[in-house]
UniProtKB/Swiss-Prot annotation:
Protein name in UniProt: Phosphoglycerate kinase
Catalytic activity: (2R)-3-phosphoglycerate + ATP = (2R)-3-phospho-glyceroyl phosphate + ADP
Organism: Trichlorobacter lovleyi (strain ATCC BAA-1151 / DSM 17278 / SZ) (Geobacter lovleyi)
InterPro entries: Phosphoglycerate_kinase (IPR001576), Phosphoglycerate_kinase_CS (IPR015911), Phosphoglycerate_kinase_N (IPR015824), Phosphoglycerate_kinase_sf (IPR036043)
Lineage per the UniProt record: Bacteria, Pseudomonadati, Thermodesulfobacteriota, Desulfuromonadia, Geobacterales
Key words of the record: ATP-binding, Cytoplasm, Glycolysis, Kinase, Nucleotide-binding, Transferase
Gene: pgk
Amino acid sequence: MPIRYIDQLKDLKGKKVFIRVDFNVPQDEKGNITEDTRIAGAVPTIKYAVEQGAKVVLASHLGRPKGEKKSKYTMAPAAKRLSQLLGKKVMQAPDCFGPDVSKIIDSMKPGDVVMLENVRFYPGEEKNDPEFAQQLVNGCEIYVNDAFAVSHRAHASVEAITKLVPTIAAGFLMKNEMTFFDKAMSNPVRPLVAILGGAKVSGKLEVLETLVNKVDKIVIGGGMAFTFLKAMGYGVGKSLVEDELIPTAKKIMDKAKKKGVTFYLPVDCVVANAFEANATNFVTTVQEIPEGWMALDIGPASATLFAETLRDAKTVIWNGPMGVFEMDAFCRGTFAVAEAVGNCYATTVIGGGDTDAAVNKAGVAAKVSYISTGGGAFLELLEGKILPGVKALDVKK
């Protein structure tokens, strides 16, 4: 799919450039940003547009205000943080369209940056309403999507707007996301190893069915592993199991065997008598999980086994933690895998949310080839889907 990037556009000077960013970042109760990776990730694109003399109009969502104006979801803290990262003032608009916003945009000078208010303050955003998209355009001549993490959503500021602006392009963050994903999945150096974790098989069913056709090894950890272990006949106590997916788990393992894909599951785990941070816990083999106990992390032998699978890997994709890593008693498996991924001699791509947080907590983020900003978007790419926000950038359409 041919996509044009912002550095391929001619003469941005004096032009109004609408950049869709994803500043949906965590904040504390006082509205202070606690983690700014997504804001920092968009800086190269914004900086480039500023240096080229564009009048930069930024749009993003924050949280789920459900189509209503709610002060706790204002973009003002993001604009303030961006000002610090850019080293220049970022104006905060009072809304995302309307006379007051038009007045600000019309008075902008080359190199100025304005942050529109939360686009999800209006129901038209999530409905992909073309009329709402038209209001967002506000005289902008160029549209740039640098919001990979929301590009799996066909929303007005991601999809509908691309039909209303003469020139469309992708930003540098989007380019990095697509380049590394393509390197890892479309044209990987093999062996290609996929590590999947997280709570439920149901959330990654399509991913698993796609990966079985593409990878050389699959490593399964986290709560989802216990549906597979039960499918193999193990008693798993009170561990999380999706009984209705046991037949599907069997089919996936059978398919992996037929395709010559090596399938790794935990051999031991940390079990607890309750889903609590201070619960009584101990390590046991997966064959000996006591009745009434639940597995909340992989054990040390599993961590060693999983690390061994990466020794000859040339490409590694990881999505999902190995246990309830937010609780100190059940974080060791995730951190051990993070260290193994960080230390392996391969192209390593980390996908989304919890995995990103785990890699940062483990202190190995700098050793990873690429950390994706997208959770749901990354998973949909793994499923083999074309993201609506990416499809909308197709210059041939």
